[in-house]
Amino acid sequence: MPRLSQDNQQGHQKHFSRPSRRIQFLPPPWTEAYNVNVHQTVENEGCATAMHNVKLLGSPAAPTLLSLLSGTLSGFARFFALLLRRPPPEAPLRRRDFSALIPALPAAVLSPGHEERPGRLSLLLRAALALPGRPPGGRLPREVDASAGQSSSIPPMGSEWMEMRKRPVCAAQEPTACAPGQPGVENQGSNACCFCWCCCCSCSCLTVRNQEEQRLRRTSYEARTEDLPTCEESPGPTLEEASAWAQSFDKLMLTPAGRNAFREFLRTEFSEENMLFWMACEELKKEANKATIEEKARIIYEDYISILSPKEVSLDSRVRETINRSMAEPSRNIFDDAQLQIYTLMHRDSYPRFMNSALYKDLLRSLSEKAVEA
């Protein structure tokens, strides 16, 4: 590194040998008082960390900077102090509208000595009295007064309304279920358990309903069979004849004795009208007079085809439509399709049960005993 010249070295030493000319700015006396005031203000505002031993810079701008900082800090301190003191905001409460309940409340429900309270207090009081519960008097407002024989006029609400709807039904069933000395009380006592439908319990009301339907069906059948024609007049069957019925259904239907025995069995199954309809169709085929054919066809239609008849037979819609179109000009064969359908029904459904019935077996036993005695 090249060395400095002698002139430069002398100038350098002369420059550094001069006394320092920097001006030492001392803080004025009023800044110390301001420092004390700032410390007291921060402590009074409740700040957790007070500023102790604040040192001012030795500059003319230090007081201005300090005043700005102290003002800002004191403002923040006041702001956070207010936030800590303020309670958290609450969610807005939803007000109920009890205006519909107020007209239903009688003035007598209010306790004596209480006057009408205006405004919100009156609304709350009326709403509380309208709710179901026990009032301070110790008696429900809708309870029947035993001494006066009168009940309150407050309308029932909620589940109480459902209970009141059930009471008339239960009251109507109690005389038949609980009256002593009547026949069938043992069976009906358990039938009053409930009268409302419930999907999770099995109630004996269904059993009572089925028994009632069977009783009505039996009564209706007995009423409609009062005007039925009597059985065909025929001699009693022989053992060989009765045994031939088991060979085929046609052999059973060919003999009057077989038809009478089969008709008696159908009567026990409440389906005697099938045999009567088949026999009426056979009688219609024997007629030759047009007026007689029309009259008998009309009678057969009203007795066995019409949906209003208690002796209606079971036919499909196609056969019914064919008969309805042909009733304008009926003929002897107007019911052939319906007769064949009923014949097939008796053959497939009733005939096998007749062969296994006690009626047919008893008939064979009695005929066998007569044959042995002879």
UniProtKB/Swiss-Prot annotation:
Residues 1-11 have a biased composition (Polar residues). InterPro entries: RGS, RGS_sf, RGS_subdomain_2. Retinal-specific. Expressed throughout the retina, including photoreceptors. It is a lipid-anchor. Residues 248-364 form the RGS domain. It is found in: Membrane; Nucleus; Cytoplasm. This is Regulator of G-protein signaling 20. It comes from Bos taurus (Bovine). The lineage of its organism: Eukaryota, Metazoa, Chordata, Craniata, Vertebrata. The gene is RGS20.
